[in-house]
From Swiss-Prot:
It comes from Beta vulgaris. This protein plays a role in synthesis of starch. It catalyzes the synthesis of the activated glycosyl donor, ADP-glucose from Glc-1-P and ATP. Its EC number is 2.7.7.27. This is Glucose-1-phosphate adenylyltransferase small subunit, chloroplastic/amyloplastic. It comes from the Eukaryota. Prominently expressed in the leaves. A lower level expression is seen in the roots. It is found in: Plastid, Chloroplast; Plastid, Amyloplast. The keyword Transcription regulation does not apply. The gene is AGPB1. InterPro entries: ADP-Glc_PPase, ADP_Glu_pyroP_CS, NTP_transferase_dom, Nucleotide-diphossugar_trans, Trimer_LpxA-like_sf. Its main location: plastid.
Amino acid sequence: ITVPSTSSKNLQNSLAFSSSSLSGDKIQTTSFLNRRYCRISSRAPIVVSPKAVSDSKNSQTCLDPEASRSVLGIILGGGAGTRLYPLTKKRAKPAVPLGANYRLIDIPVSNCLNSNISKIYVLTQFNSASLNRHLSRAYASNMGGYKNEGFVEVLAAQQSPENPNWFQGTADAVRQYLWLFEEHNVLEYLILAGDHLYRMDYERFVQAHRETDADITVAALPMDEKRATAFGLMKIDEEGRIIEFAEKPKGEQLKAMKVDTTILGLDDERAKEMPFIASMGIYVISKDVMLNLLREQFPGANDFGSEVIPGATSIGLRVQAYLYDGYWEDIGTIEAFYNANLGITKKPVPDFSFYDRSSPIYTQPRYLPPSKMLDADITDSVIGEGCVIKNCKIHHSVIGLRSCISEGAIIEDTLLMGADYYETDADRKFLAAKGSVPIGIGNARIGDDVKIINSDNVQEAARETDGYFIKSGIVTIIKDAMIPSGTVI
């Protein structure tokens, strides 16, 4: 359960609506031989139509060969998730619950499936049991039909005679499993993060990569000056080719990273508002290029964003930017996680919507009954499946699966992650007889007259033995915690 500093027995969470608009111009390129990286004869001009690169709903993609046979999706599960602790105490970061019914990993997997990419690996090395269980239950082993041999598989870090160490970074994680990835007869690898919230058509991303004859294509997010200092920025030439990188620049270095974003499809007005482009940590990399970069050019590089991609630019590879102008959020901290979840309750239009029929978000079928609300006052909230809510007040909150909320509770600006199971009547009677608290919210047991309001506006506190943490002023009740009756946090 996560709660802000001004809520009463509350926790928060939000999701957001996304859309994107991209376009391109005529581009002329010269080629680099993928394996040897020597300059060869120049190619004929390549025309990238605005529709082809656009992420608008009216545009069409004509990939040949199609993505289901020619693209391998690789989702990086991230590190230990220390900034999301205690949510990552017993689970990998991609397995953290999201939007009442989902988990973070459902976002990139659903984007892949909606983009006709059905061969997907998820790399992880921390607390992967719940992630593995969720993926095996949510996604069939023959997705896309037997012809396309679709799958979603978890690859956990493992030691071997060649690699005695755990994953040292994003690039090292991919390098350790290159022996498996290169067995697939594909043209490109699509590298994704497992902790981002957005909706994107990867087919158009791949199409832009092919039409510009790029070796690597980096998804780029337009930025204003205020946000730009927190991201790794890129500079492009008039063809959309990346020529320079800067990690979280400030002052004169920041000004030097301004680019003309109309090159990537923004209109003049928006280009003035957003004169910077930031890397989203999402890449399309041609297969031969990936093998050469990780094994021969940069065998000691551990990270894509800070080492491999800038290194590829320095040796003359064609590294293109692909603009994504839609909602995107990095769910890397408690504050970002809380705000993104509560964003789905935003009026009149949420930041991210799960109600998009054209590109749905998939998850594990749980076969839960409809939620039951008895004399409850609920406003501006999202309620998950299988909840029982009795005579209480809920405002601007997200209520997770199987949540049982009893009479008199007041929940505002709060995210409840839900419970893993229901307690039987016999269990509840037994607990009541010995003075204990029945399960209710997210496997946490919260007694009568408890107030979780952070009235002192504490910003940081670690009270794990008491069952809660405070980060950025947001109170998080940990899983399986028991908060005794009358407690004030």
